[in-house]
Amino acid sequence: MEVSKEEFLRQFGGDYGYPGAPKGVDEMRAAEFKRLEGMAYLDHAGATLYSEAQMADVLKDLASNVYGNPHSQSDSSMAASDLVTAARHQVLKYFNASPREYKCIFTSGATAALKLVGECFPWSRESCYMYTMENHNSVLGIREYALSKGATVLAVDVEEGADLAKDNGSYSLYKISRRTNQRRSKDVLSHNCQNGSLSDISGNNWNIFAFPSECNFSGQKFSLSLVKLIKEGKIPLQQQGKWMVLIDAAKGCATEPPNLTVYPADFVVCSFYKIFGYPTGLGALIVKNEAANLLNKTYFSGGTVAASIADIDFVQKRKNIEQVLEDGTISFLNIASLRHGFKIIEMLTTSAIERHTTSLATYVRNKMLDLKHSNEINVCTIYGQQYSKVEGLKMGPTITFNLKREDGSWFGYREVEKLASLFGIHLRTGCFCNPGACAKYLGLSHSDLVSNFEAGHVCWDDNDIINGKPTGAVRISFGYMSTFEDAEKFLKFLQSSFVSLPVQFNNGYMLNLNSLNLIDNSSQKAVSDIHLKSIIIYPVKSCQGFSVKSWPLTTGGLMYDREWLLQGSGGEILTQKKVPELGSIRTLIDLELGKLFIESPTRRDKLQLSLLESLADLSEEVDVFGQRYEVQSYDDRVNTWFSEAIGRPCTLVRCSSSKYRSCTYTGLRDRPCRDTQSKLNFVNEGQLLLISEESISDLNSRLNSGKGDCKQKLPVDAMRFRPNLVISGSSPYSEDNWKKLRIGEACFTSMGGCNRCQMINLHQDSGQVLKSKEPLATLASYRRKKGKILFGILLNYEDIMEGENETIAGRWLQVGQQVYPSTE
């Protein structure tokens, strides 16, 4: 046993691995989660995993029994109804909720349960919707219903005292501070009132206080004693009226479901895939009877009415609250599968799961806090409650963090995510749909958030650092089947990828993590030895290119290069990262015939397109990597050909012009501004990509040394990187230092290194697309610079002639031409 595991077990052996259960975690992992071999799945806050036995039981159940629509009275329907009833009781039992006091309403998920509360709650102009800052967007969304009825909305910060573990239900243990009141303008409310959507005050006005049992951003657990304090009106910020409490348990219920007998909240929401992985698309609203009677549902549907008449205004809703609130036929087969998911939870017990996952999170958290660069700067900034290594008692099995370089600047979370994927580590990045916690912990002001949005940052994009600040974070989270080996794999990943060691020099190379190797200029070959070895044109973006001996240049670079692209049915740009099948489509241009030839192994007929064809009547605009383009579309014949070739609906468009704009990216980390005077076809950044044979040879020697992850040890050729120009005769990576270069009579400016992604790990072999971690994993070990993995350089063609026609006539590239670089 390794020393680190011995150390871990000495501290956490009583909690880790389910020592009192029929199966320990290692035995369970080997039997039920064989698919996890070689990877560390650390996104259980997003979705935990289903076990093999669970899915086998589900399949056996469905294969052995007949379940009919529970709205019927047949034997199969009654069997389904009985299972639904049993499932309701099992869910209530999980939350220790008495069936006499609570009802279980099945929904399509926690979000649907929250929406149901928001739209059915009796909001009035005297109501207040109060929620903690650390709430999911789905909880924040309820405010739209409250605001539309004239209610006040208030976000609050809740800080818990150090002695809360001795909980005596005292408000003095909390510090609650308010944010700005939110109310709709009088004009909007007046419009709503005229349309009958404002409620008059009649009797008691009702209010809601919402908080998560565990914050999905940071893992901070909120004390459930808030339930009693709110319901007893002991919080000074509470206005008059009756208060209901809503708990978002979507994250927390996987390890510590709220005990509703002890803490009788009015509404609790959950999603079952967060607990045991399957089924997805199924959640529940656990609602107290008194609160359920308040919910006034306007819409009625199949299954919710006792009687209705089609041609007059008559409807009588059912008395059973579950039937009133569950529209249409519920997902009865998914509901029937819940019992198979609960089996393993009941075998292990939630208290043991909580101890197991917390032991892993506490161990990793403490180790992360120990990580320092060679200059003693802390590597990890962890978000959540302020804790020491001894007290982490209020944290769930979630760690959210950002990483710093030795100079104090931030690693972008997308860089962390990209590198983690190469190590087989699955984690989550961004703000996790929790804008309040994200802004609070990252120190982002309202103006920061607005300016980030105006700079182009939206959820799920790659803008991870703006104006020197992170826009999101990295999150790892543990589940009931997580192991020490998962934790150790993650820690080794951090150590090897982000911790800077003292600088050493060896044969002219700087050996320092997170920075690019320097080149020993004394070993560079004579400039006269460098020549152009290959020219490759890629007419259709992400499809195969073709090699030529010579080719004309235009203001956009190589003529017809990346002048076409494919869009999906939703208008999205299709690339090999999304559609690997694009790599099997071959292209060829015959300049004399004026035709583009396209063929696919899945199509017998070849497609021919005229280079001079006018498609002006079908002009439209698209956005590609932040650049607006005017494009021309093709007819159904062409689109059908491509759709059948790649196996999904798509359309082909051709670039007719790009709309130039000034650089708007000055605030973004190391993002090069496009030259607004240069025409760009559908390229990501530069007009051309250049790589050298010597750099490829050096990469292959590293791959063959066994240090990489490439099992087959096959050499990587130039085409894996989709270059336009391949040169020969230089030293490895000497192109990194070039500012300008001349090939023949054509001049180019270097736009810097090309940032590589997982697309270079795709390999076409005998018509199949093979995926591996190489060569990107090896490149990441020595070609990283400020969040980018660089290989090759991007070039822009310097058009020194006036007029595009003169450029076409006067500038050709030819294989064999000398290359004259300049570093000044």
UniProtKB/Swiss-Prot annotation:
Native organism taxonomy: Eukaryota, Viridiplantae, Streptophyta, Embryophyta, Tracheophyta
Residue ranges of every copy of the MOSC domain listed in the record: 655-822
Function: Sulfurates the molybdenum cofactor. Sulfation of molybdenum is essential for xanthine dehydrogenase (XDH) and aldehyde oxidase (ADO) enzymes in which molybdenum cofactor is liganded by 1 oxygen and 1 sulfur atom in active form.
Protein name: Molybdenum cofactor sulfurase
Active site positions: C433
Gene3D superfamilies: Aspartate Aminotransferase, domain 1, Type I PLP-dependent aspartate aminotransferase-like (Major domain)
GO biological process, one term: Mo-molybdopterin cofactor biosynthetic process
Highest rank taxon of the organism: Eukaryota
EC class name: transferase
Pathway the protein acts in: Cofactor biosynthesis; molybdopterin biosynthesis
Recorded catalytic activity of this chain's protein: Mo-molybdopterin + L-cysteine + AH2 = thio-Mo-molybdopterin + L-alanine + A + H2O
GO molecular function: lyase activity; molybdenum cofactor sulfurtransferase activity; molybdenum ion binding; pyridoxal phosphate binding
UniProt modified residues of type N6-(pyridoxal phosphate)lysine: K274
Cofactor(s) for this UniProt protein: pyridoxal 5'-phosphate
Alphabetic keyword roster: Molybdenum cofactor biosynthesis, Pyridoxal phosphate, Transferase
Protein family per UniProt: Belongs to the class-V pyridoxal-phosphate-dependent aminotransferase family. MOCOS subfamily.
TM stretches of this protein: none
InterPro entries hit by this protein: Aminotrans_V_dom, MoCF_Sase_C, MoCo_sulfurase, MOCOS_middle, PyrdxlP-dep_Trfase, PyrdxlP-dep_Trfase_major, PyrdxlP-dep_Trfase_small, Pyrv_Knase-like_insert_dom_sf
Native source species: Oryza sativa subsp. japonica
Iron recorded as keyword: no
UniProt EC number: 2.8.1.9
